[in-house]
């Protein structure tokens, strides 16, 4: 999860987030190289006394500054499109969870079980236990199995919301009357925190998301005791 004074992205805990981190570094490297080239060119122009006074056209230069940007943009677009298709690809999910946004809480339904659903509200500051995080803890955590393909169905019952868990690379809009889906697969156990990422009213900041990823056997035990 995030920590104070953090400058970079959160540690990746899913294959999608790992790909996003690689793409971030790839794009940032290209931006750094272009910025360095531009600054170098500007410094040369400011320090040199040479001037082109008789040049009417420079077809070679015009060709190069047309081809090079196209190559650079292609090198950025192709990995981006690959990740975009990866986020939409869902292959034989073993579990389907439906998340509904409300003002201002989330409700979850485990559609593979007959009676396993609950509402998830933010824990008030006065009710926090030692070690719990202010504005991020909930009364009912969403327990999920790790290393398992999970399909998330996301919608809303009132206004626009957005279901986001940064360390898993997840952010999907919750739109009234529309059912969006995304895939989730965590590579390690633990607690993963997120929040509503769409301004949805006065208590928008009080819609935390807490996913508790556990081994499959522990999840089966929890689901049996809960349902």
From Swiss-Prot:
Query: According to the UniProt entry, what is the EC number of this protein?
Result: 7.1.1.9
Residue sites binding Cu cation A2 per the record: 196, 198, 200, 204
Note whether Transport occurs among the keywords. Answer: yes
- Keywords on record: Copper, Electron transport, Magnesium, Membrane, Metal-binding, Mitochondrion, Mitochondrion inner membrane, Respiratory chain, Translocase, Transmembrane, Transmembrane helix, Transport
Transmembrane domains' residue ranges:
15-45, 60-87
Name the GO cellular-component terms. Answer: mitochondrial inner membrane; respiratory chain complex IV
According to the UniProt topology, which residue ranges lie Mitochondrial matrix?
A: 46-59
Q: Does the keyword Iron-sulfur apply?
A: no
Tell me the leader sequence span: none
* Reaction(s) catalysed by this chain's protein: 4 Fe(II)-[cytochrome c] + O2 + 8 H(+)(in) = 4 Fe(III)-[cytochrome c] + 2 H2O + 4 H(+)(out)
Query: From the Swiss-Prot or TrEMBL record, what is one GO molecular function term?
Result: copper ion binding
Cofactor note text: Binds a dinuclear copper A center per subunit.
Assembly and oligomerization: Component of the cytochrome c oxidase (complex IV, CIV), a multisubunit enzyme composed of 14 subunits. The complex is composed of a catalytic core of 3 subunits MT-CO1, MT-CO2 and MT-CO3, encoded in the mitochondrial DNA, and 11 supernumerary subunits COX4I, COX5A, COX5B, COX6A, COX6B, COX6C, COX7A, COX7B, COX7C, COX8 and NDUFA4, which are encoded in the nuclear genome.
Q: What is this protein called?
A: Cytochrome c oxidase subunit 2
Protein source organism: Galeopterus variegatus (Malayan flying lemur)
**Taxonomic lineage per UniProt?**
Eukaryota, Metazoa, Chordata, Craniata, Vertebrata
């Amino acid at each position: 999860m995030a920590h104070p004074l953090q400058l970079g992205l959160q540690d990746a805990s899913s294959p999608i987030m790992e790909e996003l981190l690689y793409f971030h570094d790839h794009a940032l490297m290209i931006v750094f190289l272009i910025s360095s080239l531009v600054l170098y060119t500007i410094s040369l122009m400011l320090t040199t006394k040479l001037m082109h006074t008789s040049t009417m056209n420079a077809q070679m230069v015009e060709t190069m500054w047309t081809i090079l940007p196209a190559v650079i943009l292609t090198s950025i677009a192709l990995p981006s499109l690959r990740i975009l298709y990866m986020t939409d690809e869902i292959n034989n999910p073993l579990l389907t969870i439906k998340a509904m946004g409300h003002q201002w809480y989330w409700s979850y339904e485990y559609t593979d079980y007959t009676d396993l659903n609950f509402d998830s509200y933010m824990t008030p500051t006065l009710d926090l236990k030692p070690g719990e995080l202010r504005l991020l803890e909930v009364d009912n955590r969403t327990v999920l199995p790790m290393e398992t393909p999970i399909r998330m169905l996301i919608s809303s019952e009132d206004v626009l919301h957005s279901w986001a868990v940064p360390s898993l690379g997840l952010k999907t809009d919750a739109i009234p009357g529309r059912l969006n889906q995304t895939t989730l697969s965590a590579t390690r156990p633990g607690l993963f925190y997120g929040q509503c990422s769409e301004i949805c009213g006065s208590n928008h900041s009080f819609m935390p998301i807490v996913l508790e990823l556990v081994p499959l056997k522990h999840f089966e035990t929890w689901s049996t005791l809960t349902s």
